[in-house]
Amino acid sequence: MNLRITSSEIIKPSSPTPQNLKSYRLSIVDQLTPNVYFSIILLYTKTTENPTKTSDHLKKSLSETLTRYYPLAGQLKYDQLIVDCNDQGVPFVEADVSNHMSELLKLPNIDVLEQLLPFKPHEGFNAERSNVTVQVNYFGCGGMAIGLCFKHKVLDATTAAFFVKNWGVIARGAGEIKDVIYDQASLFPARDLSFLSKSVDEEFLKAESETKRFVFDGSAIASMREKFTHLGRRPTRFEVVSAVILGALISAAKESEEPPERLDTIISVNLRQRMVPPFPEHCLGNIISGGLIYWPLEKKLDHGSLAEEIHQSIKKVDDQFARKFYGEAEFLNLPRLGANEVVKKREFWVTSWCKTPLHQSDFGWGKPKWAGNSMRLNEITVLFDTSDGEGIEAWVGLPKKDMARFEQDATIVAYTSPNPTIL
């Protein structure tokens, strides 16, 4: 792709942050979140005829959005576990792309997609980088790609999706944005964790891993939900897609040179609506926990049973669970955070961006043709809604030797399309 950076500047909040809001405390959930970045890429096939007008429009509305999300324009102080809300702003990079966007949409390629980002998230963590960095890419055909990188320590995927959606709301003048700051640090205060020896900062982002895109369309998911009904309960879209992915991973692990005894899976769960009273759905921070599944490889693989285990693991993550796990620090009892286990296991993560408002990011020229990311992952899958809301797009990151087995799994072959066109 022929891309040329044309400008770079800092966008600051349109109004100064009041003195009494200058310090934003991190919660224990933020504290436990790895020092990594995640990204969002939005592709628009047509915007306006005037790039200069579009640029000014985006900068002005971003500035106003940062006034609501003022910690994102601040500086993370690791030693104090706070964000200094000093209004330092966020970098805003612009680039011209001579290629036609149809080339990108025809065959999505992670190496090409990551050029649309202000930096490559997998190339290491830099504590000095801003909490958010934006790159707007103008295609000669009139299309546009907005790429954003976020510091995960400060926010989760739900926050990021609402941030981009609300940026669009402000850009369109389509309504007021509710208060996004919620003091979860009072409920889940940060702690001294210096005694923990294991770091997961680079656990998900390793050079020897390979990330590939698999799409389950709506009809395939409907078929799977019928086929994998268990004890009369029809699994959800998320449950059945996760079960098929984990099933393929289990099968691949059995064929590996040194197969583990057990697959441990962590299912990322949004806590906002599970708390009592519920947190605002759009509030800032890492407000997530994990459902846990332990699957011995000697156990017979049944996708219906696996989907049911996923369902039950998520069901357990409620208000009481969160208050004990984080508020009373029960997470310290997890073997993966310290003590050695006799069991030879493999860990895998499933995180879902489904039902987030990513596809509602409209800046005045319509919703995106495609919304997703270009993360290079390891032992993790990230799920997104397809643009029609019926299918699910899975980005799966595995060691290369395991990816070859995974993508040849009969169920994956039967129900997915590997990296299909977006056109």
From Swiss-Prot:
Q: Which keywords fit this entry according to its UniProt record? A: Acyltransferase, Transferase
Q: Name one GO molecular function term.
A: oxidoreductase activity
Q: What is its EC number?
A: 2.1.1.-
Q: In which pathway does it act?
A: Secondary metabolite biosynthesis; terpenoid biosynthesis
N-terminal signal peptide: none
- Give the active-site positions: H152 (proton acceptor), D362 (proton acceptor)
Tissues expressed in = Mainly expressed in petioles.
List, alphabetically, the InterPro entries matched: CAT-like_dom_sf (IPR023213)
* UniProt xrefs under Pfam families: Transferase (PF02458)
Protein family (similarity comment):
Belongs to the plant acyltransferase family.
- Subunit relationships: Monomer.
General function of this protein: Acetyltransferase involved in the biosynthesis of limonoids triterpene natural products such as azadirachtin, an antifeedant widely used as bioinsecticide, and possessing many medicinal applications including anti-tumoral, anti-malarial, anti-rheumatic, antibacterial, anti-inflammatory, anti-pyretic and diuretic effects. Catalyzes the formation of 21-O-acetyl-isomeliandiol from isomeliandiol.
Q: What is this protein called?
A: Limonoid 21-O-acetyltransferse
